[in-house]
UniProtKB/Swiss-Prot annotation:
Binds 1 zinc ion per subunit. It comes from the Bacteria. GO terms for cellular component: plasma membrane. It is an enzyme of class 3 (hydrolase). This is Protease HtpX. It comes from Photorhabdus laumondii subsp. laumondii (strain DSM 15139 / CIP 105565 / TT01). InterPro entries: HtpX_protease (IPR050083), Pept_M48_protease_HtpX (IPR022919), Peptidase_M48 (IPR001915). Zn(2+) binds at residues 139, 143, 223. The keyword Protease applies.
Length: 295
């Protein structure tokens, strides 16, 4: 989940910075076609900047340390497990990192399949059996082998393009209306530049949040495939055991609305649309039924 959250936050930040610069400098599409081209350039630009920065951002955010030379038996096992699985799926050896955190967690990121990173938390190494940890690592290796980050980037670029395009069209209409421009003036002016800038920023945030429903759906879909990839690499039972360990480790104490933010995803409310991972029960059931194993 961390790689998705970091990717989306970085992407949103880049989009907002681009939007502010364009508004302050007065650089805007002179026509609908021009606006679409500009939206595409900055929409995909934000997504690819996020992708290129993903490893650096991820390591910096968690304080992760890349293992250059294994210092102990645990690090040696981790590096060799990643190496073995990478060879099985025909990708270059990813960088391997550990970060200090009590949570059972791991993530994979990187701009290319052959220039990737796999990071695991100390909580995962301390609280999971080797078989369970092996399955989690295989899940992350499957994300890399499947090219999920690049595919997510392309999807995010398309979503960004439409968010920027629609937001700026509506912002221009709002600004022109509040400025009292005539129809002729409206076609050549965005009205009050301050109103236009504020309206476009607010609309980009709102539409960006709504558009995240699409990217989160795709993320949940790819999680099922990564689970299946792990099952193929290390065995279905190991992956099921790892998910069951996650389920017992993250049994929620919160009530009501807060339950939606728990990793096990038991809540079946509207907020599930914004979850990057499917509920653990659904993932376990998909593995048991073999729903994604032959896809």
């Amino acid at each position: 989940m961390m790689r998705i959250v970091l990717f989306l936050l970085t992407n949103l930040a880049v989009m907002l910075v681009f939007g502010i610069i364009l508004s302050l400098t007065g650089i805007q599409g002179s026509s609908v076609q021009g606006l679409m081209i500009m939206a595409g350039l900055f929409g995909f630009g934000g997504a690819f900047v996020s992708l290129l920065m993903s490893k650096w951002m991820a390591l910096r955010s968690v304080g992760g340390q890349v293992i250059e030379q294994p210092a102990n038996e645990v690090e040696h096992w981790l590096v060799e497990t990643v190496r073995s699985q990478a060879e099985q799926v025909n990708i270059a050896m990813p960088q391997v990192a550990i970060y200090a955190a009590p949570d059972i967690n791991a993530f994979a990121t990187g701009a290319r399949r052959n220039a990737s990173l796999v990071a695991v938390s100390s909580g995962l190494l301390d609280n999971m059996s080797r078989a369970e940890a092996e399955a989690v690592i295989a899940h992350e290796i499957s994300h890399i082998a499947n090219g999920d980050m690049v595919t997510m980037t392309l999807l995010q670029g398309i979503v960004n393009t439409f968010v920027i395009f629609i937001s700026r069209l509506l912002a221009q209409a709002v600004s022109s209306f509040l400025s009292g421009n005539s129809d002729e003036e409206e076609s050549n002016s965005s009205g009050n530049p301050i109103v236009y800038m504020v309206a476009s920023m607010v609309l980009e945030i709102v539409f960006g949040i709504l558009a995240s429903i699409i990217t989160m759906w795709f993320s949940r879909y790819r999680e099922f495939h990564a689970d299946a990839g792990s099952a193929k690499l290390v065995g279905r039972e190991k992956m099921i055991a790892a998910l069951q360990r996650l389920k017992t480790s993250y049994e929620p104490q919160e009530e009501g609305g807060m339950m939606a933010f728990c990793i096990n995803g038991k809540s079946k409310t509207f907020s599930e649309l914004f979850m990057s991972h499917p509920p653990l029960d659904k993932r376990i059931e998909a593995l048991r039924s073999g729903q994604y194993l032959n896809k």
